[in-house]
């Protein structure tokens, strides 16, 4: 199903040769209007410009060839239809489908195979139950606290703040994730428990951080003499320890085939987004994601937004050798989006083993980082322009702000100034500027792309979420790795459990290295 191995692809050989002399973005006339128009794509409310990437037509044709040799569209089709994509052949692995797309497939008319259709059907049933629940909960409660970790917090939190500016709401929303009790304490200080709905999210029902934070909140409710069962909601797998209606006001379900970092369109995101903005806004969010799911099956790379972005990322990572990628949204609403992308990209593709269980000899996920513009122009952009490492940048922007507040100063609005800065940074990174004073010299040739929509709405938020989900999936398919497990998370958790045993005096085995470290910090005597 994967075609040739990544390093065996003929297209890769051609790309390696092109990478020796990539297009010079600093050359006079390089960024002509013709190039800018030609190297752009408009789809599902977005316009994507990649004229400032170091690619030309020959390079793009070779990247298209690589997508065909690796059968990337076929792999995407298989994933959406419920094939076993989360696997390592010949070794113990999760061996399950990857069906986050099915959680929103029911909002459009899609022909799905059996397992995908079942998840879509169950997702619709859960959404309808959610609508009934929200009718009562939104009338009764003014505040919601979501307790979760990883994908149970990062994606929903990013999407909540993305939608907050365009969806009027009188609801207060808080997120508690860190096992550090100060995280829970600062939220407890801000809320009226009687007016608060607590949503606990854990697929297994046993995850350490949500369990500890749930206990802190349960103790707070007990101390106030309030009914826990009337204020707590669970989002978990069927049959998990949390799947217990006697302990919760309501229990919503998710499935093993939906990974945490891809779960924002399931009830993991549905309860908090629906409570905050209403059921209709949540459906609009799902519709945006579902539209990109369908679009991601477009065969031609230059007409397929997530595939094109994925392959430009492969070019920058594997052919030009850039180790990091910065994602810079010029929108306050996306202030937590890069943190979500760090998990979605690096937990998915930070792998060194192929799907055949073999060590790989090429680079996979870049380090993903970033912050909101224009703020970050006054922090790390100095390094992007004149540092020793070239960092590809993915700019995200909007032509109109969310809240409508603006002013005109010196002949332009704040929204215009914001967008002008986005464009200026992309051009400055690409073209650079020569100067006789070396301290004022900008080398240029730093690649970037620009993704723009009219305004950050619930539908656009859903589309943006799905765009990056599919971008990372396509890259994993190209590299031949399993983008859908996270074994790297487990070792530290196992050792932490042993160390907790030592600290509590109940260690089942000796762990001298840990004892030594604990004694150093006076945790053990």
UniProtKB/Swiss-Prot annotation:
Disulphides: none
GO process annotations (BP): gluconeogenesis; glucose 6-phosphate metabolic process; glycolytic process
PROSITE patterns registered for this protein in UniProt: P_GLUCOSE_ISOMERASE_1 (PS00765), P_GLUCOSE_ISOMERASE_2 (PS00174), P_GLUCOSE_ISOMERASE_3 (PS51463)
Gene Ontology CC annotation, any one: cytosol
Biological or metabolic pathway of the protein: Carbohydrate biosynthesis; gluconeogenesis; Carbohydrate degradation; glycolysis; D-glyceraldehyde 3-phosphate and glycerone phosphate from D-glucose: step 2/4
Enzyme nomenclature, EC number: 5.3.1.9
Keyword Magnesium part of the UniProt annotation: no
Keyword line: Cytoplasm, Gluconeogenesis, Glycolysis, Isomerase
Catalyzed reactions per annotation: alpha-D-glucose 6-phosphate = beta-D-fructose 6-phosphate
Active site per the UniProt annotation: 347 (proton donor), 378, 493
GO MF, one annotated term: carbohydrate derivative binding
Localisation per UniProt entry: Cytoplasm
InterPro entries in the cross-refs: G6P_Isomerase, G6P_Isomerase_C, Phosphoglucose_isomerase_CS, SIS_dom_sf, SIS_PGI_1, SIS_PGI_2
Cross-referenced Pfam families: PGI
Known function: Catalyzes the reversible isomerization of glucose-6-phosphate to fructose-6-phosphate.
Family annotation (PANTHER family): GLUCOSE-6-PHOSPHATE ISOMERASE (PTHR11469:SF1)
Family from the record: Belongs to the GPI family.
Protein name: Glucose-6-phosphate isomerase
Annotated source species: Chlamydia trachomatis serovar L2 (strain ATCC VR-902B / DSM 19102 / 434/Bu)
